[in-house]
UniProtKB/Swiss-Prot annotation:
SUPFAM superfamilies registered for this protein in UniProt: dsRNA-binding domain-like, Ribosomal protein S5 domain 2-like
Domain notes: The N-terminal domain interacts with the head of the 30S subunit; the C-terminal domain interacts with the body and contacts protein S4. The interaction surface between S4 and S5 is involved in control of translational fidelity.
Organism encoding this protein: Nostoc sp. (strain PCC 7120 / SAG 25.82 / UTEX 2576)
GO terms assigned for molecular function: rRNA binding; structural constituent of ribosome
Known function: With S4 and S12 plays an important role in translational accuracy. Located at the back of the 30S subunit body where it stabilizes the conformation of the head with respect to the body.
Keyword vocabulary terms for this entry: Ribonucleoprotein, Ribosomal protein, RNA-binding, rRNA-binding
Gene3D superfamilies recorded: 3.30.160.20, 3.30.230.10
Gene name of this polypeptide: rpsE
The protein, known as: Small ribosomal subunit protein uS5
Amino acid sequence: MATGRRKANRTKKEETNWQERVIQIRRVSKVVKGGKKLSFRAIVVVGNERGQVGVGVGKASDVIGAVKKGVADGKKHLIDIPITKSNSIPHPIDGVGGGAKVMMRPAAPGTGVIAGGAVRTVLELAGVRNVLAKQLGSNNPLNNARAAVNALSTLRTLAEVAEDRGIAIEKLYI
């Protein structure tokens, strides 16, 4: 029985590094035979500020339940991103999610996160401190968050590019 207790403590410690932020809570309705059934949809971003981030959506009859489901969904859809020493992204990148397009560019140390809305939340919880980002197309928070995650998931380090090409990192730009 003592081993079960230790495992429970370990999982609690692991869960404390995750931060979650609610991007949007929206009341939605479903038309049924007896009238309209109201429920809530929560869009939640989960991250550890050390290169892992995920976007989740939860629906429930109450707000708290929707947020809990959103957090669980976000943890299921986590991605790892490479972060440079200057807490930026390695290279310029574009992402698409639905009708939303997101453009991200690395920035010099001290610039901060210059982004709006859902994209800013995703970048902050991913641990990116210096970046320039622009939302293009849709201003839907869910699609913009998904576009940001799509962009971040395609980031690659110099070592990964050199390995894919089968050459040494030193010869990459010669």
